[in-house]
Each structure stands twice: as structure tokens, then as C-alpha cells.
Design a protein with these regions (language model features):
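Short, positively charged low-complexity motifs
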Residues: 4-7, 13-24, 31-35
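C-terminal and late-domain segments of enzyme folds
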Residues: 41-67, 77, 83, 87, ...
Length: 263
């Protein structure tokens, strides 16, 4: 999201054990990183990005990385919203990853032109974890598809984690509620905010979409659907649902998902 002032990018870079800005970081337990074959991971959740309730879940997610995390957050989905709203996402992301004690860069990229600037593409090359927060899924898709940024996103998937919440999750399906997605999850429509009373309209939307050919991947708050190569699983506090016609499968933390359910 965009910071106040003339600078088109606001970047706060966190180091393990300290903050690379003028503010000091509070000591916290470092994330431990696994030693394993390279991952190609997608992790998406229905809601709750950067909030205290998902902190421990994100700590576990970061543990999947093969190397020390370099997290990049982008609130491009909210690019058409107010400066105040963009500042909200910016500050929330900064505080969240500061508490996780990992290196973090927040890029202010509000649209397609912003995303495809050289400094953004270079940040993508240096990162191994990119997170797209909420807003308009269609604006986010229009900002990414068929671009140099999209190419870098595919490269990042081969060495790290593409993560998203709400609109940032929806774009990774083959199709969205309205429009098409980036097709990281073929044959799938991602439905965020599943089961939340504030989004009661989603229940009717699911009924309508379930008449079509796509599998519905319904995500609850603070819970990731994780795709690691050909392995599917759940990480978090609530549930993930796969709905197709008369079938409704529910999964919770630690569950493995048969890949055929999304084929």
C-alpha cells in the first residue's frame, strides 16, 4: 500500500534479531527453518491476515521455507481504496512480521504499473514468501496477469511460498466468483470468509456456483489451505471445505486432502 508523501514505495525491512529501520524490535523467539527438498507452495486463507489470531499459524507456515524468510507483502487488491485504508494494511503487515522476527518488505504497489516497476521485480527476485492481502480480487487480477510481475510470481512459486487472504486467495483459482483467476489451482473457485456471519451472502453464492463445473474451495478464518507440490493439507485453527455438487468435505488442522477432490 502507499505511504504518505511523495515516495511511491514504502519499504520496512526487518532482520532476524532487529529492525532495519529507526524503530527497535522487541526480542522474540526466532522461527526455525526446516531442511528438506525445495518447496513449491501455495497457502491461502479465508480471512484474518496480519491479525494476532493468525500469528502462531503464520509462524508454522514460515517454518516450511527451506531458507531464512524474506517476506514481501502487497496490498494491491486495496489499490483503489483510501489512503487511510492502505495505511491500515501497511501498518498491520509491518507489526505482524516484526512480531514474527523475520525480514519483511512492504511494497506500495496500487496497480499494474506499480507492480511492474523495476524495484518491485527486484524485490520479488530477492523474496521467498509473497503475501497478497484483501480488497478487490478483480483489481488484483488485472494488476498481475500477463506481466513481468506475473513471470516473477511463477519463479517465486518454485523456490518459496505464494500466500494470500480473501481477494489475495481468490485470484489463485482458475475462476473467481466474478471473472477468471491466475489458475494456480486449476478447476477451482476459491471462496473466502466461509461461515462468517458478516458475509452471509456467501452461502447463497456457493449454492449458485455449485451448479457449475468448478470445485469450490471454501476457506474459513485463520486457516490455510496448503498446496505443496502435489500434496494438499490444512494448517490453522478452523476448517477448509471442498464442495462439489452433492459432496461436501470438511478438513481441519493437520488433515491431508486427496488431490483428486480438486481435479
Amino acid at each position: 500500500m502507499e505511504a504518505a508523501g511523495s515516495n511511491p514505495v514504502f519499504r520496512s525491512t526487518w532482520r532476524r534479531g532487529g529492525v532495519a529501520t529507526q524503530r527497535s524490535a522487541k526480542p522474540c523467539t526466532p522461527v526455525r527453518f526446516r531442511s528438506s527438498p525445495p518447496i513449491t507452495m501455495i497457502a491461502i486463507t479465508g480471512s484474518g491476515e496480519f491479525l494476532p489470531s493468525i500469528l502462531d499459524v503464520d509462524r508454522k507456515l514460515l517454518n516450511y521455507l527451506d531458507d531464512i524468510p524474506h517476506v514481501l507483502t502487497l496490498s494491491t487488491a486495496a489499490g483503489k481504496e483510501s489512503d487511510a485504508r492502505l495505511s491500515y494494511w501497511e501498518n498491520l503487515a509491518i507489526d505482524h512480521f516484526k512480531n514474527l522476527n523475520v525480514r519483511h518488505t512492504h511494497i506500495d504497489a496500487r496497480n499494474r504499473e506499480d507492480l511492474n516497476q523495476d524495484y518491485v521485480l527486484e524485490e520479488m527476485k530477492q523474496s521467498n514468501f509473497v503475501f497478497f492481502s484483501g480488497g478487490s480480487p478483480n483489481h488484483l487480477y488485472d494488476s498481475i496477469y500477463d506481466s513481468d510481475f506475473s513471470t516473477e510470481l511463477h519463479h517465486l512459486e518454485k523456490r518459496g511460498i505464494i500466500a494470500g487472504c480473501s481477494a489475495g486467495a481468490m485470484i489463485l483459482g482458475e475462476k473467481m466468483i466474478k471473472g477468471v483467476g491466475l489458475n494456480y489451482l486449476p478447476n477451482t473457485i476459491v471462496i473466502p470468509h466461509y461461515g462468517e456471519s458478516f458475509y452471509s451472502w456467501i452461502s447463497n453464492t456457493v449454492k449458485v456456483l455449485n451448479r457449475g463445473k468448478y470445485k469450490l474451495l471454501c476457506l474459513e478464518k485463520d486457516t490455510y489451505f496448503v498446496k505443496d507440490a502435489d500434496q494438499l493439507s490444512v494448517l490453522g485453527k478452523q476448517n477448509v471445505h471442498i464442495i462439489y455438487k452433492k459432496e461436501h468435505h470438511t478438513f481441519s488442522d493437520g488433515d491431508r486432502i486427496d488431490v483428486s477432490l480438486l481435479q
